[in-house]
Amino acid sequence: MQENLVIVESPAKAKTIEKFLGDDFKVMSSYGHIRDLKKKELSIDKETLQPAYVIPKDKEELVKRLRENAKKADKVWLASDEDREGEAISWHLCEVLGLDEASTNRIVFHEITKPAILAAIENPRHLDMNLVNAQQARRVLDRIVGFKLSPVLWRKVKPALSAGRVQSVAVRLIVEREREIQQFKSEPYYRINAIFAITNADGSQSEVKTELDKRFTTHDDAIAFLEKCKDAEFSVANVTKKPLKRMPAPPFTTSTLQQEAARKLGFSVSQTMMVAQRLYESGLITYMRTDSVNLSSLCIGAAKEEIIKLYGEEYSSPRNFHTHSKGAQEAHEAIRPTYMANTSIEGTAQERRLYDLIWKRTAASQMAEAQIEKTTVNIASSKFDERFIANGEVVKFDGFIKVYRESTDEDAEQQDEFAHNLPPIKEGDVLTRREISSTERYSQGPTRYTEASLVHKLEELGIGRPSTYAPTISTIQQREYVVKGDKKGEERPYVIDTLRGLKITPTRKVELTGNEKGKLLPTDIGIVVNDFLMENFPAIMDYNFTAKVEQQFDQIADGKEEWTDMMKHFDQEFEPTVDKVMNARSEHKAGERQLGIDPVSGHPVFVKIGRYGPV
């Protein structure tokens, strides 16, 4: 007879864990939740707000097998993930399998490795009902909002629409950004750049590329400045050298992994999570839903050893980072490789690429700062007060840059063609003008969200948690309120006026502007639903309210608030608003516009909104 039954939520995780335990352990999978709310009913008691859970039909046979094995076992170990969702899965198992909460062992671990699993078996705990209740609060609140808002949309906007608490706020961000872009008026300005020559000690000449410290708002002013430069002499007013240190980025959290995998690998948010899940379940990385940047002392030690072996002692600089995001759980760890000695892995191309990114980010976080010398050269003329500035950087010691450099959404826009290595140069050096040019540029408006930048914004506002970012972004696209696509740019003329010798030559060019790829765009129906919810349910759509709800979930998880009290308070305010909007009379649905009167029938004629425009 088996003595121990271990239940996890995924078959891949079960397979990995089974390798680490003896013959007296059997590992089974629950395949996620074995109980949930009914799909087509509210399934929440109107008076008590208690949820009525059911076992879905497709889980009945599995539950039967789990019950049979639980009866045979001397001990049952519930080993679902260490977050609130995982705790709820364990609680549902406890309830459905008729397990005694006091004698059932709950085990948690950050990674699926033999030492971690054995340590968890040595240190079991009881179910944490605070975590379970925080999950129940989220599930019930989201069901109430979705179930009660959707019929309002059916009646007032269009049948078959749906709304969700976090998803609707995410759509609001995208709609508002689109409107900012439409309202933005780009203004021209003129940037002045110069290329000077300096004579070196051996008689050869080197180029010094510079930019003027002033921009002009009119073409006439820019040309007038070029005229002043015709008979101007130029010399170096001063040279400043400044040592800079660059720190490595902290190890990955869920959101930073999603953002960096999008920028560096081109992965969607959901793709990143699917690949990370496979790496975790194979025992290759730690748990992938986390908002902590902490590393275990074991990992810090292993990283130090690996860095010294691969790059040398001077590259090692062990450090721990501290988490600053709202609601972060310091007990958890950042996303890191389980074994730093594994610099690469076998697997699919996606798995190898994501693992490589995680390994490099973790290693870099434990490496020395990059030491850089920044040189700024001020170039003056007796003809005017403005200065030309040349910037140069020399990497004195590459440190963590040897392995990894963090990217940003603005990388492409911030590339400076006039930042370069400078030749030997000192105060008083006389420079020869080669060319000075005025380039017409335009002020840049806001850019549309990518999946990665939307995750960053949600995290910044305190909306959602590591487990909700990917589902939120998937849901708003599945509902077709938002589409991921490309925005075709427009051709825009601009002029470059170049002074060479005593002649100013204009060159007219055309550039493509506003061309965006893989951006989140609101659909027409997404805009209509957003505007309807903003007008009628401003509290639900408020960013601060949504962030406050997340904080209340955290309070419940910490045992500082009763989840049923939170639900009752919310429903008491929400229900009357729903009733008021539902019963309000209106001549036509949201998103419809009256075109005129039908001359035959005398009835008004409306244009209706479809998903992608008027119909």
What name fits each language-model region?
Residues 52, 80-82, 99-105, 124-132, ...:
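Short, polar/flexible loop-turn hinges at active-site or ligand-entry regions and domain interfaces
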Residues 3-5, 16, 150, 160, ...:
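Basic, low-complexity terminal or inter-domain segments flanking catalytic cores
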Residues 258-260, 264-271:
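A conserved hydrophobic secondary-structure block that centers on an alpha-helix together
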Residues 216-252, 426-429, 437-439, 548:
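Metal- or metallocofactor-binding catalytic centers and their adjacent structured scaffolds
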Residues 236-240, 247-261, 286-290, 445-457, ...:
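Short acidic, hydrophobic short linear motifs in intrinsically disordered regions
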Residues 1-139, 148, 408:
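Intrinsically disordered, low-complexity regulatory segments
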Residues 112-196, 238-245:
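C-terminal or mid-to-C-terminal helical accessory/interaction module adjacent to the motor/catalytic core
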